[in-house]
Every structure is written in C-alpha cells, then in structure tokens.
C-alpha cells in the first residue's frame, strides 16, 4: 500500500497537494502544526478539509516552543503584518525561522511510524516570497539529512516547487477542487478564510494567480501539465 503524509495548513497550496495525493496514494495522512500562529484559525480549517478530502488520519501537533524562539509577525501580535509591497527586498517579517525545518522533520518522524514512503509539502520556489526554507536546495538537503538520521528512505515531495500561483490554481482545477480551494481554504496571514484580507502578500499572490488563471485558462493549464507531467 502506498502511503504519504501531507504537511497540511489548510491553505491553498497544501490543500491542492492533498487533493492530488488522494489520487496518487492509497492512504494519505495529514499533519498540521499549532505554533501559536496569528492565523491560528487555519487549524480548524485544516481539520474540516482533511475530513472532507478523505485523509486517513489528521494529526495536530503542538509545537508552541517555536513561538517562543521565532520572532515574526506571524508569532507576535505586536508586530503588524505588512501590506503587500511589490518591490520589497530581503526576507519579510512574516518569515518564521526554522518553521519548515521543524515541520518537515516532524512529518518525517510521523511518516516513519505509519510506514509512509513520502512527505508532501506545498513549498514553492517560483513564488517563495523570500523565504529561504521554501527553496528546492533546502528541501533536498533536509531530506538527505533526515534519511541519514533515521536510516530510512522517506521521499520529500514538492509538487508545486516549479509552478507559479496561477498554475497552482490550474492544478486544483485539474483535480476538480477549484471552488473548494477558493472558498474553504485559509491562506491569509490575517486569518481570513477564502479571498482573505486582500492586503497581505499571501492574499496578493493568491488573488493575482487566480485572476491570471481565470483569464488564461487553456494556456495556464497547458503550462501546468507540461511542468508537472500530468496529462
């Protein structure tokens, strides 16, 4: 039996990954992390979506220690989430240091226990927003280290790594989940479901991607299929 574990936040990217995994694996588990995040409403959204999309199990893990160590606008109410700035340089204050290091490592430990062959994460280098832990180089390096440390061959899969946000919408549509992703996921840094606050960087990427996809469906779908190998 083919099993996979999805690092699942209930946002656009991880929900699209879950929708695809349900078609590609016999059994899919979801792992969601409570780190005291500002947008903590995502945990309840993730619970509902994991159930709706047929995950075999859904674990919510308490990693609030990360909140104590990592200072970010997503872990401190005293630090405002900035509005989207198209020409911003450097790492944004929404970056949570160590988050994906911790999430992927814990998901791999869970995968070890349930005998899953893959850990799936929705990180993306095309629209990575300046986060160093969303890069392909990082994911591959951590995958190698985790496998060495557990003497196990668990594969870190990144289905969205080389597609942009419009193509991510196309992928959700390909699996018949466009409206669910649009209406029921939570991507917004301010914790607003669906189309979100409309001001933060996450909402801007999501909205621009959707608008581009809806305006150029055939071309974007074709590009997505070419990049992912789907037919």
Swiss-Prot record:
GO terms for biological process: queuosine biosynthetic process. Its cofactor is Zn(2+). It catalyses: 7-carboxy-7-deazaguanine + NH4(+) + ATP = 7-cyano-7-deazaguanine + ADP + phosphate + H2O + H(+). It is an enzyme of class 6 (ligase). Pathway: Purine metabolism; 7-cyano-7-deazaguanine biosynthesis. InterPro entries: QueC, Rossmann-like_a/b/a_fold. ATP binds at residues 8-18. It comes from the Bacteria. GO terms for molecular function: ATP binding; ligase activity, forming carbon-nitrogen bonds; zinc ion binding. Zn(2+) binds at residues 188, 197, 200, 203. Binds 1 zinc ion per subunit. Keywords: ATP-binding, Ligase, Metal-binding, Nucleotide-binding, Queuosine biosynthesis, Zinc. Belongs to the QueC family. This is 7-cyano-7-deazaguanine synthase. The gene is queC.
